């Protein structure tokens, strides 16, 4: 999930940011035109998915076909939840400190990570709630986009915001740490807590470890 030894030209980054703004604008327009009843239903499905994750004790590192089937919501799979429009955007992330605003996509495929932030399947959907822990991945150093390149500037006490449909969630950074890739398996939901962890590769250009920015919801 890392790009090695690449820098982003300013022109390419500007074009990619314009694309990201268009994707977010399309998402905002789609959800604004949606009936309130439909928005509420989509969020309720996501809440039920998160409740199932917690109740069944399923984590991303043990996600097989049986677990995916157990997590179906009224026959809907993970990829079918929180779909406000056809692009696959489930919401967007804003980090004011580093002037970042990125769409959030289902999964951590290269396609998703080249365009924005990827949500790690098998972790809580980023809609908040007790005993939830959403994990969001982003690239650093893509040749065409800045993405999570400046994530290391975040410090304890800083905040970031996630918007999914008409639900706006604010998280405060509680801890930053650097771990080995295999140590991500310890990221699980904690009872009664509402958490999000942002993940990218580090050191920049080496990418042997993962930088984790842990946040807990404050409003």
Mark where each language-model region is.
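Solvent-exposed, non-transmembrane regions of membrane-associated and secreted proteins
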Residues: 4-219
């Amino acid at each position: 999930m890392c790009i090695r030894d690449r820098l982003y030209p300013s022109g390419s980054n500007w074009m990619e940011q314009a694309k990201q703004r268009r994707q977010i604008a399309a998402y905002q327009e789609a959800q604004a035109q949606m009936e309130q009843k439909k928005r509420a239903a989509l969020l309720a499905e996501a809440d039920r998915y998160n409740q199932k994750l917690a109740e069944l004790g399923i984590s991303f590192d043990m996600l097989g076909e049986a677990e995916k089937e157990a997590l179906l919501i009224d026959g809907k799979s993970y990829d079918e939840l929180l779909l406000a429009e056809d692009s696959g955007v489930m919401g967007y992330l804003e980090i004011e400190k580093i002037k970042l605003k990125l769409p959030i996509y289902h999964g951590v495929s290269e396609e998703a990570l080249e365009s924005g932030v990827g949500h790690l399947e098998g972790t809580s959907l980023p809609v908040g709630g007790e005993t939830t822990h959403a994990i969001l991945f982003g690239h650093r150093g893509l040749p065409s986009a800045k993405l999570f390149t400046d994530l290391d500037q975040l410090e304890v006490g800083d905040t970031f915001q996630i918007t999914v449909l008409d639900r706006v969630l604010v998280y405060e950074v509680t801890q930053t740490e650097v771990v080995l890739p295999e140590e991500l398996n310890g990221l699980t939901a904690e009872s009664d807590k509402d958490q999000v962890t942002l993940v990218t590769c580090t050191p920049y250009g080496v990418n042997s470890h993962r930088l984790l920015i842990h946040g807990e919801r404050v409003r």
